[in-house]
Amino acid sequence: LKDVLSDVMDVGIETIEAGTVDGAMAVFLKDKSIQVGGGFHVVGGKKLAAAIKKAIRLAQEEDDFPQEVQIRFDTEVYKGISFHTVTVPIPPQEEASRIFGGELQIALGTSDDSIYFGLAPNSISFLKGIIDKNASSGSKAVRPMELSLALLPVLEFASSFDDNPVVNAMIRQLKTAPGKDHVVLSVTMEKESTSALYRFQLEEGVIKAIGAGVQAGIAGGLDF
């Protein structure tokens, strides 16, 4: 295990020293389902993949490792990226089965200079979609950091599990302003300076939705 941690640390250090730290992650919510995916640029991707495989094999040797968990390495190669999968059965009585269904599927994609991950039904197909979208976007200038949250899918996801009048009021309001439901946090570096400018933005639809939620809460007897 010490060797595994050392290899992971080496990849992290070499990536930082190369001067390029680049990555992205996205969460997709729909009804009672969730999909998570992302990717990162790394230096020494094969070394990182070998370390991950070794760590998993060590875990499999433990007596309490669940035998029902299915792990497959190098299942296929797509655009130079090797895929590995982990499938975890979920008993129907578990709360997680309401979101992921009968099993949790995790896919990992590794190459010389990148690592991708996906958590979704048909996780490899989902991950291929992320890889294709990343390739089609090409190289372009981006902010050092940007976090964008679309509020409507989040509230609809929550509403699929709990019928809440405040949430329902916010959903109705957001649907009157399509595409204006984002909460954005961004970081911009100042020119010729080491200073950073942080910006927090609420789109028009979000502000109105908050107001609608407050009104629904007051009407329902909630104390704000």
Predicted feature locations:
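Signature of soluble extracytoplasmic/periplasmic domains of secreted precursors
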Residues: 1-224
